[in-house]
From Swiss-Prot:
Cross-referenced CDD domains: PT_UbiA_COQ2
Main function: Catalyzes the prenylation of para-hydroxybenzoate (PHB) with an all-trans polyprenyl group. Mediates the second step in the final reaction sequence of ubiquinone-8 (UQ-8) biosynthesis, which is the condensation of the polyisoprenoid side chain with PHB, generating the first membrane-bound Q intermediate 3-octaprenyl-4-hydroxybenzoate.
Entries under Pfam families matching the protein: UbiA
Pathway info: Cofactor biosynthesis; ubiquinone biosynthesis
Gene that encodes it: ubiA
Name of this protein: 4-hydroxybenzoate octaprenyltransferase
Organism lineage string: Bacteria, Pseudomonadati, Pseudomonadota, Gammaproteobacteria, Chromatiales
Record field: catalytic activity: all-trans-octaprenyl diphosphate + 4-hydroxybenzoate = 4-hydroxy-3-(all-trans-octaprenyl)benzoate + diphosphate
GO (cellular component) term, any one: plasma membrane
GO molecular function ontology, one term from the record: 4-hydroxybenzoate polyprenyltransferase activity
Cofactors, names only: Mg(2+)
Length: 285
């Protein structure tokens, strides 16, 4: 039993929690702005737990979708489905179980949030298959991750205002950037096995395109702060985040997969300082 639990934890990537934080940060941005710095405690707990559950579910369905590809990619060759330690049926049952628990939590919220959750579940379930059909699965991941933003506004305020959609777009831009960095790690393997990604699409222009996307993201976050009346601490956080974006571009210069992965991981700090700026604004307002 213990060994099975370890395998299921690996399927859910509980040993690599950075993905949970990358999904959590924009959710917290949204909850703090929607709640003017004081989100409803029940809503906050539901979303934190829901983020962990749905990120875990996303990892499981991703491994199920990639079970034929992962044995041929160096980074993924030891995943449970790739090695045969877990079966496809186990993965699907685990995915369904995680989604059911997450939906049970959503039922504690208002009808608008419940309705939005169906679109979120569809995005999460279909994202892993996008790399077969489009070079933009990273943007699709952004939509899946970003869907927590309108849901957070709906849960906190009962509406989905323009600010929610602007934050959603910002999250799509952000996820496209950091998941492109992630895709750059596997680019050579992905070319061999025939799957698509923005890393492949951008090719030698990857640094330029991701830098432009980061610039657009920072400008959008600046505009959101202006619209919402956020003050000094928010812009301080945004300035630090801009520094992190520059550092990520510096890491890409070496053209080494290990540095691409470091650039990906650094986005956890990017998301954290944005949240810190939002939280400090409301604490000191």
């Amino acid at each position: 039993m213990k060994q099975r639990l370890i395998i299921y934890a690996q399927l859910m990537r509980l040993d690599r929690p950075v993905g949970i934080f990358l999904l959590l940060w924009p959710t917290l941005w949204a909850l703090w702005i929607a709640g003017a710095g004081q989100p409803d405690p029940k809503v906050l707990l539901v979303f934190v737990a829901g983020v962990a559950l749905m990120r875990s579910a996303g990892c499981v369905i991703n491994d199920f979708a990639d079970r034929a590809f992962d044995p041929h990619v160096k980074r993924t060759i030891n995943r449970p489905l790739a090695t045969g330690k877990a079966s496809s049926q186990e993965a699907l049952l685990l995915f369904a179980g995680l989604c059911l628990v997450a939906f049970g939590l959503v039922l504690l919220l208002n009808p608008l949030t419940i309705g939005l959750s169906f679109a979120g579940a569809l995005l999460a379930a279909t994202y892993p298959f996008m790399k077969r059909y489009t070079h933009w699965p990273q943007a699709y991941l952004g939509a899946a991750f970003g869907w927590a933003v309108p849901m957070a506004f709906a849960a906190q305020t009962g509406t989905v205002p323009i600010a929610a959609w602007l934050l959603f777009i910002a999250t799509v831009l952000w996820a496209t950037v950091y998941d492109t960095f992630y895709g750059m790690v596997d680019r050579e393997d992905d070319l061999l096995i025939g799957v698509k990604s923005t890393a492949i699409l951008f090719g030698e222009g990857d640094r330029l395109v991701t830098a432009l996307l980061q610039g657009a993201l920072l400008l959008l976050l600046f505009w959101i702060g202006y619209r919402e009346g956020l003050g000094f601490y928010y812009y301080l956080g945004l300035a630090i985040a801009a520094g992190f974006a520059g550092y990520q571009q510096y890491l890409l210069r070496s053209r080494e997969p290990a540095q691409y992965f470091r650039a990906f991981l650094n986005n956890n700090a990017f998301g954290a300082v944005i949240f810190g700026g939002i939280a400090l604004h409301y604490l000191t307002a």
